[in-house]
């Protein structure tokens, strides 16, 4: 069996031409529940340490903490263009680095969502994504589920998709983004013990089966009864990890490389070898 050269690889109509590398930083940290001002301050400090990265990714609900309850999440929820977004836009400009952060979003109709927002290095809001698959009583007690909206945006020549924590555990979500052209799927998370196998195994599997990069930014430490499992990572299309944190606070940086993605797609043609006519009924069950 012969393959086309990796440098010319196009799989399922997805080209790997363009800007060759991107530097992505993940900040793994213990949560500071209810301390928005304190979280903005440490974001500023971390962003100044990550100025050599093109993008800084923070955990799920970074601004407010995750396990904070309905009353607190209602009090701390903000609009997409709220005061915290304006502050983070200024931080992104000062650092010259795009920032993806998790926060409780209050929509114009009063619904509260578990959301992430991307602000570029010029301080412009590029994208807001709402968690679509809510996890257990914890999420269901605080948030409304996001609707059928899986945005794909371009940053520095790379196509980015977004998921939040539990979303990545449904393989259809990552595949949908990959088929739409995502080269990097960003996953702010608040993953806890005993689900650490997700950080260890699932993230690499999603990257490999979809032939794209997956960046997974988790908490460490604990929040009330929750013990977070750390292990933030950037998984490559070949299933390797180009950056990996342990169990403690860490700022890790990895370089995404289009050549590696092209080589991997030339060897593993999952996207073009699909037979969707065999799977149509699966999503209807």
Swiss-Prot record:
It is an enzyme of class 3 (hydrolase). The keyword Hydrolase applies. The keyword Cytoplasm does not apply. InterPro entries: Aliph_Amidase/BUP, C-N_Hydrolase, C-N_Hydrolase_sf, RamA-like, UPF0012_CS. Its EC number is 3.5.-.-. GO terms for molecular function: N-carbamoylputrescine amidase activity. Signal peptide: none annotated. One of its GO terms (biological process) is putrescine biosynthetic process from arginine. The active site is at residues 60, 131, 165. Residues 22-258 form the CN hydrolase domain. Keywords: Hydrolase. It comes from the Bacteria. PANTHER family: BETA-UREIDOPROPIONASE (PTHR43674:SF2), NITRILASE C965.09-RELATED (PTHR43674). Belongs to the carbon-nitrogen hydrolase superfamily. NIT1/NIT2 family. This is Hydrolase in pqqF 5'region.
């Amino acid at each position: 069996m012969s393959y086309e050269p990796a440098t010319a690889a196009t799989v399922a109509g997805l080209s790997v031409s363009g800007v060759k590398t991107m530097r992505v930083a993940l900040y793994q940290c213990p949560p500071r529940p209810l301390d928005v001002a304190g979280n903005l301050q440490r974001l500023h400090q971390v962003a100044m340490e990550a100025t050599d990265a093109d993008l800084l990714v923070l955990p799920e609900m970074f601004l407010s903490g995750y396990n904070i309850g309905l009353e607190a999440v209602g009090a701390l929820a903000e609009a997409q263009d709220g005061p915290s977004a304006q502050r983070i836009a200024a931080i992104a400009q000062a650092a010259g680095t795009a920032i993806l952060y998790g926060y409780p979003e209050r929509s114009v109709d009063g619904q509260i969502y578990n959301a992430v927002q991307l602000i570029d290095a010029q301080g412009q809001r590029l994208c807001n994504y709402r968690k679509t698959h809510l996890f257990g009583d914890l999420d269901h007690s605080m948030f409304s589920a996001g609707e059928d909206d899986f945005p794909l945006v371009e940053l520095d020549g790379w196509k980015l998709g977004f998921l939040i924590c539990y979303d990545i555990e449904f393989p259809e979500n990552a595949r949908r983004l990959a088929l739409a052209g995502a080269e990097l799927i960003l996953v702010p998370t608040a993953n806890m013990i005993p689900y650490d196998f997700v950080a260890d195994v699932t993230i690499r599997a999603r990257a490999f089966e979809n032939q794209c990069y997956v960046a997974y930014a988790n908490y460490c430490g604990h929040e009330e009864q929750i013990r977070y499992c750390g292990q933030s990572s950037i998984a490559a299309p070949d299933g390797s990890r180009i950056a990996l944190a342990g169990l403690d606070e860490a700022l890790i940086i990895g370089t995404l490389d289009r050549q590696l993605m092209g080589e991997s797609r030339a060897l593993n043609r999952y996207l073009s070898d699909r037979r969707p006519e065999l799977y149509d009924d699966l999503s209807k069950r």
